[in-house]
Amino acid sequence: MEQDLARIEQFLDALWLERNLAENTLSAYRRDLSMVVAWLHHRGKTLATAQADDLQTLLAERVEGGYKATSSARLLSAMRRFFQHLYREKYREDDPSAQLASPKLPQRLPKDLSEAQVERLLQAPLIDEPLELRDKAMLEVLYATGLRVSELVGLTMSDISLRQGVVRVIGKGNKERLVPLGEEAVYWLETYLEHGRPWLLNGVSIDVLFPSQRAQQMTRQTFWHRIKHYAVLAGIDSEKLSPHVLRHAFATHLLNHGADLRVVQMLLGHSDLSTTQIYTHVATERLRQLHQQHHPRA
C-alpha cells in the first residue's frame, strides 16, 4: 500500500509542477485518491491491477452511501487524471478510468442575495470595535471585488493600492489579475488600516492585510463563521448563505445593472466563460420574479 500512496505523491508533484494547482485542490486530490487506494487494497487490488469494474463499483457504493453527485464527480475527475498519469508513465498498459460513466449533475444556481440584503449584511458589523471594523472592511472589499474567500484572506499589504483604488489578486493557477475597489471599499480600508489593524497586530509585524485576533493569517473557515454571524444580525435566511455569497452577489448585481459578461469573467478570474454564464441565469430569474410581482398582466 505504501508504494501506491507514493504513486499518489508523485502524481501530485507532477500536477503542481505542470498545472500549478492550488494547495486546496492538491489536498482534495490526496484525500480522494488515498481513499481509492485504501478501498482497492481492502479488496485485494492495487493501482496496477484495478479494473474499470472496480472503479465503477466504488462510485456506485458512494452513491448508495448518500454521497452527493458533486462529490462523485470530483472523485471521478481525480481518478481520471491519476490513471491517465499512470498510463503515460507506463506504470499501466491501459487506463481503466476511461470507461467510467460520469454522474449527472444538476445545474445549481448560485445562492443569491438581493441588493437590500447585501446592504443589511454590510451594515451589520459594529464599526467602533477594531475586530468588527476589520470585518466591515473585508465585507466591503468582498462585495466590491467579487474575490474568492481564499483570495481575500490571503491578501497582503503589498497587494492593495489605495491611491489607485485597485487590488492585485493571485487566483487559481497562480493567475494574477487587478480588480477595482470602488470608493466605499477604499474608504473602509483606509479607516480599518488607521483604526483597526494596528490594534489587531498589537506590535506584531506581518504583511497580512486582514490578520486574525491573534495577529496571524485568518482561515477561510473563520471568515465563514463571521459571515454567518453577521447574516443572523441582518435577518438573512441561512439557506441563502454560502462562503461565496458576496462573490455571487457581486456578479449577479453587476449583470443586473448591464455589465458585459466578459468583463465580469475577467473580474471574477474565471478561465472559462461558461462558468460566469451561470450568473446570467440568476439575473434572468430575478427579472422574471420582478415581472410576476409587478406587471399587471403577469
Tell where the protein language model's regions lie, with residue ranges.
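Conserved catalytic core of the tyrosine transesterase superfamily
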Residues: M1-A298
